């Protein structure tokens, strides 16, 4: 047995092979732009070409391009197909001419393949099958060739990359928004109200009269220093100590016309947080004139949460807050949690927060937004990075 490899054997791929030549009852009309175009019988037919015997008086040369019309008879109906052929071989002895199809359209190729395949398998070709073959897509799309001389231009690639990057950024932003919304819904508790609270002391009007402040708002006043002066009538000063003779109308009118002035002093080393009565305005006895804040008094933040957030605002819980008018985000710790009202049941909880950084007394009364975040913390990672000097 000879197992030697024959070097002359060439293996073709299936895409390079053509149908075998078959003898099929078909005719070819040679188009020569004349009314009496000759009609010849096809000797051999394949998917790549055909052969016929040239009629007398016609001579063809190799390489010549001729036009013709293939004619088939199917279900007693004629099927014609215009083709363009190139002469590849000419037998002068027998007059046989071998031609190769040129520039066949996709429908023509599909029809030829269907006729040849049906003939080889012994099936009877019907007109319905031919029409069905012409209606469907019998060819796959050409693959994209990756090369420098094909594909998109540099501008086209830039546009594609820009569009893809834009879609990616929009998708990333949408994912971030959804993640933030879900995180805030399940892991973040917001206070319904909050303010900066500082222990204050009220200074009241000793007598009825008009007021004139001596210390501006947010100004400092030492203990015993004058805060304001007031003017009142003599009648107000002597009220309660007048006898029967002093109650005469003329005497009362005289006392009312006399004015006396007095001075109010600061009861502590304080800062004037608020002035509740404007200069030159009348104030009744006992009315609160000033609210004083002890100097260097620790400021805290008071906030109100709903009772459903009971487990989120326990003493010792870390919170973050932002004071109105500031961009800085501060942190603190809840030191107490009480019911909003001591006399009845309430749906709100009042918490007191001790800030990590001291607050200025000028911030007293400002609204505060308080947030309790109970989600996974990465503070340990930040502390480790700061310790490493990153």
Curated annotation (Swiss-Prot):
Q: Which InterPro entries match?
A: MFP (IPR050739), PilZ_domain (IPR009875)
Q: Which GO terms describe its biological process?
A: alginic acid biosynthetic process
Entry's localization field:
Periplasm
Q: Does the keyword Zinc apply?
A: no
The keyword Lyase is assigned to this record: no
- Supply the Pfam families for this chain: HlyD_3 (PF13437), PilZ (PF07238)
| One Gene Ontology CC term in the entry | periplasmic space
Q: In which pathway does it act?
A: Glycan biosynthesis; alginate biosynthesis
Q: Where is the PilZ domain?
A: 16-117
**Annotated protein name in UniProt:** Alginate biosynthesis protein Alg44
Q: Which organism is it from?
A: Pseudomonas syringae pv. tomato (strain ATCC BAA-871 / DC3000)
The encoding gene is alg44
